[in-house]
Regions:
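Boundary at the C-terminal end of the N-terminal hydrophobic targeting segment
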Residues: 19-21
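Hydrophobic alpha-helical bundle signature of multipass membrane enzymes
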Residues: 23-186, 210
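Short alpha-helical linear motifs
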Residues: 123-128, 156-158, 194-202, 222-225
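C-terminal membrane module of polytopic membrane proteins
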Residues: 205-227
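Interfacial helix-loop-helix junctions of multi-pass membrane proteins
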Residues: 178-209
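Bacterial N-terminal signal peptides
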Residues: 8-15
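Positively charged n-region of N-terminal signal peptides that target proteins for export
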Residues: 1-4, 193
Length: 227
């Protein structure tokens, strides 16, 4: 699969060529910094909440929840499929569900375009680095904590899969929420990073809804789970 991103102003163009389709997907990217609040400032209750919860997260190692956070850290279509297919109620793979797989790739590309400017602007240090602890997985870019990119894509995936299979919305959205919380358990994000990620994920999904090409992919995906 070949992916190419052409950014012009606030317009993102994602070109994806696969065995089943060649689509040109264009969506507008709003300035996320103008929408979400900045990270909590030191001395505020929200900041103290971030510190308290994140510090406590380093004491839940060797638990099932910690192991789930490690698994959820797999940032790839394979990882997303593994995280969501049980809640989705249908297996997800490049071979069996190529349209859904293509959507996961599109979301992965789009997430970086939506979150990277804010991450670079706020330059927030991740919890494991701040507290001199070890994260549940090896993590680079220690100053890109806000907002959470994993949460953004996890929430957007949950919204998208719920549109494809609405009969499983309860299970899918619960899993999407857990996917975000895994970032706190992992020690790589503060609660406010994750909360911002849920919002950015919703914004990203709303922008994708304006794309006729994306809607056509959704319709193909709906047909896949009927087979």
């Amino acid at each position: 699969m070949i992916k190419k991103i052409i950014a012009a102003g606030l317009l993102l163009t994602i070109a994806i060529t696969s065995t089943f389709a060649t689509d040109q997907l264009s969506i507008r990217i709003p300035d996320i910094k103008q929408i979400i609040p900045p990270p909590p400032s030191p001395g505020t209750l929200l900041y103290q909440n971030d510190m308290d919860i994140s510090h406590a997260s380093f004491f839940v190692k060797n638990t099932n929840r910690y192991k789930l956070a490690q698994s959820d850290a797999n940032y790839s279509p394979e990882g997303f499929a593994q995280a969501f297919e049980k809640a989705f109620g249908h297996s997800i793979s490049k071979k069996e569900t190529p349209a859904i797989w293509n959507i996961l790739n599109q979301l992965e590309v789009a997430e970086g375009e939506f979150t990277k400017p804010a991450k670079l602007f706020y330059h927030r240090t991740r919890p494991f680095a701040y507290f001199h602890e070890k994260a549940c997985v090896k993590t680079d870019n220690i100053h890109r904590s806000y907002p959470s990119g994993h949460t953004t894509i996890g929430w957007a995936i949950a919204l998208t899969l719920s549109e494809i299979n609405p009969s499983r919305t309860d299970q899918i959205m619960k899993r999407g929420y857990e996917f975000g919380q895994s970032r706190v358990v992992c020690g790589v994000h503060y609660p406010s990073d994750v909360n911002a990620g849920y919002l950015v994920g919703s914004i990203m999904f709303s922008q994708l809804q304006t794309s006729p090409e994306f809607q056509r992919e959704i319709e193909l995906a709906k047909q896949e789970i009927l087979k």
